[in-house]
């Protein structure tokens, strides 16, 4: 997982944080020296509680008549949170608010595809 996280952080200086949860395993890494960063405990609960719930709800809605769910993009005050479902969990990436985040979504997805986490 370290190579995947390294690749995602190297994609752009606008990638603030990467978290990968698969089953009970959660790996988080934050870029050093961030302004407006969340606390480590807050990030942990977001990955264990908030993002899985968000993905469950939006996946169920997407499966009704919207063609499923590819990802969720949340705009918090200090950053964007890009959350993708993967087998047994999610990949969550915080992006700087100045970033044209939509432009980073496809390169992020391509890296996850190379690591066989999304199709």
Where are these regions (language model features)?
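Non-catalytic interaction/Regulatory regions outside core domains
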Residues: 1-119
């Amino acid at each position: 997982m370290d190579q995947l996280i390294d690749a995602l952080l190297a994609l752009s200086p606008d990638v603030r944080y990467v978290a990968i949860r698969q089953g009970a395993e959660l790996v988080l890494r934050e870029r050093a020296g961030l302004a407006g960063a969340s606390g480590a405990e807050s990030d942990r609960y977001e990955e264990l509680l908030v993002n899985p719930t968000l993905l469950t709800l939006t996946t169920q809605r997407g499966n009704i008549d919207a063609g499923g769910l590819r990802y969720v993009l949340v705009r918090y005050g200090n950053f964007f949170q890009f959350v993708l479902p993967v087998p047994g969990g999610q990949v969550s990436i915080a992006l700087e608010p100045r970033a044209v985040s939509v432009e980073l979504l496809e390169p992020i997805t391509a890296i996850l595809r190379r690591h066989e986490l999304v199709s």
